[in-house]
Design a protein with these regions (language model features):
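Internal catalytic-core helix/loop-beta-alpha segment
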Residues: 93-146
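Short, surface-exposed acidic-centric catalytic microdomains
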Residues: 55-115
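Hydrophobic packing residues within well-ordered alpha-helices of enzyme cores
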Residues: 75, 146-147
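Short, solvent-exposed loop/turn segments at secondary-structure junctions
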Residues: 51-55, 69, 103-106, 141-145, ...
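C-terminal capping/extension of enzyme domains
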Residues: 2-44, 53, 65-67, 111-124, ...
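Short beta-strand segments
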Residues: 42-48, 58-61
Length: 199
């Protein structure tokens, strides 16, 4: 019965995401629509950004502005990546889900600071559909701000931990080595959850 409920919720969210993505190109060029989540069968960590860059929206894939964002560089230091593996397969194969705090917003250019009139994604419902997720990771200060503005801590059960990390964006004036060291917690969480689910 519980699985049926999750399945129905997942189908509803998928319909909304498909409808949402098909409306990606808008007459209002400042209106930016986010992507559907990347998620596999048993995610342990949900990483939330703010809103994808224009390059990512155009390609319908997360963190594609790779000259200005170190996300995949960080992930490749933490997890082994197979030759020729797509970004999405690489992420979900390591029990990570990707999404954003913002579903849609007005934004001129790529800067998160320019986001206005934003509408949040239904992250609470997403976590209900994917009960294996134990930790939400907020990618940067603005993602943290957007998340807590829309979702008070009381909205989540005690089993969900929420942590904020230095932004993977190169706009964050922090050395890569410092970012990598802070982001290692993602690997620790994945490894710990893998052991729990094996027992």
């Amino acid at each position: 019965m519980r699985n049926k409920k999750y399945f129905e919720m997942a189908c509803q969210m998928e319909k909304q995401s498909t409808k949402h993505s098909s409306a990606m190109v808008s007459p209002n060029q400042s209106l930016k629509l986010g992507l559907k989540p990347w998620v596999g069968e048993s995610p342990y960590v949900l990483i939330l950004g703010t809103l994808p860059s224009d390059i990512s929206i155009k390609s319908q894939a997360y963190y594609q502005n790779k000259s200005h964002n170190s996300f995949y560089k960080i992930m490749e230091h933490l997890f082994q990546r197979s030759v020729g593996q797509s970004d999405e397969d690489f992420i979900i194969s390591n029990h990570i889900a990707l999404w954003d705090c913002v579903k849609k917003a007005n934004r001129k250019g790529n800067l998160d600071a320019n986001i206005k009139d934003d509408i949040p994604n239904d992250i609470k419902a997403f976590l209900q559909i994917h009960p294996t997720i134990s930790t939400v990771v907020l990618n940067g200060g603005l993602a943290k701000k957007k998340f807590y503005r829309s979702f008070p801590v009381s909205d989540f059960s005690e089993r969900i931990k929420v942590i904020s990390l230095i932004s993977s964006s190169n706009a964050a004036s922090v050395k890569f080595e410092e970012k990598l060291e802070e982001w290692r917690i993602v690997k620790y969480i994945i490894d710990a959850q893998t052991r729990v689910h094996k027992d």
